[in-house]
Amino acid sequence: MGRSPCCDKAGLKKGPWTPEEDQKLLAYIEEHGHGSWRSLPEKAGLQRCGKSCRLRWTNYLRPDIKRGKFTVQEEQTIIQLHALLGNRWSAIATHLPKRTDNEIKNYWNTHLKKRLIKMGIDPVTHKHKNETLSSSTGQSKNAATLSHMAQWESARLEAEARLARESKLLHLQHYQNNNNLNKSAAPQQHCFTQKTSTNWTKPNQGNGDQQLESPTSTVTFSENLLMPLGIPTDSSRNRNNNNNESSAMIELAVSSSTSSDVSLVKEHEHDWIRQINCGSGGIGEGFTSLLIGDSVGRGLPTGKNEATAGVGNESEYNYYEDNKNYWNSILNLVDSSPSDSATMF
């Protein structure tokens, strides 16, 4: 624990200093120096505590203390330092030579503070009272304005970011769709570039003479020829198919029974094109097998078979031979065509 304060000792005098006490203190310090302030009162013969002797010497009895009235420059310095430092009188006193902190404090409270109040200046903030009142309301208005501007700015930035994201997504989607279309069109283009002359052409609908164009033949099949054979024409097909690309191709299917009918069957265009374009050789044999087949016996449509049911085996055999010779003559024309063979390769 610390020492007890010297002022608490019994028999010590308090209150204002008398001239006799000031004289004793001055005489002792001039002769011996102040030394220890705690033991100085007993040596100097004073009924005072050491703290009281120190303050009396520092604030009043020092020979370098400047007495008298404060100048205008000193007043301005005190006001400026008080605005910066506040009530730190010891720090203010260091900037005023030969002026004590106690004297500066007393002069502030008795003169300078009252003068500022009369001028309409707050002695604490050193600002006009009207400005202090308006500053509180002005700060609130400025804060509200800044908050409103910040909200608009944040909303604008969010909108710009959202538009940028949507534009990027649309660009990526368009790019992916183009890639998918290019990938799907690549196999067809590769297959068709091998033999471009074998592409089928869609016959004109609505004409009386419709042509069935072969990839390797220039033979024209009229509608009058196809009807007795039981081959359906384009007029009997679906007329609602408006697709620009060929949606179906024709394939001949032959049944093995004696009353089999020769008919055309729609097959997917890719299977037929792959068979024609990507096949290696044997185009004439393939066309022959589709039209004639492996069996020698070919029947006419059902109506023709019923009409010739009473004919004998010999007449029936002669009719089949004539039919076979008829198709062989057509195939010979196909094989001997120089223009088609030139366009194929």
From Swiss-Prot:
InterPro entries: Homeodomain-like_sf (IPR009057), Myb_dom (IPR017930), Myb_TF_plants (IPR015495), SANT/Myb (IPR001005)
Primary localization: nucleus
Domain of life where this protein originates: Eukaryota
Keywords, in A-Z order: Developmental protein, DNA-binding, Nucleus, Repeat, Transcription, Transcription regulation
Pfam family, one: Myb_DNA-binding
Domain HTH myb-type: 9-61, 62-116
GO biological process: cell morphogenesis; cuticle pattern formation; regulation of cutin biosynthetic process; trichome branching
GO molecular function: DNA binding
DNA-binding region: 37-61, 89-112
Protein's name according to its UniProt entry: Transcription factor MYB106
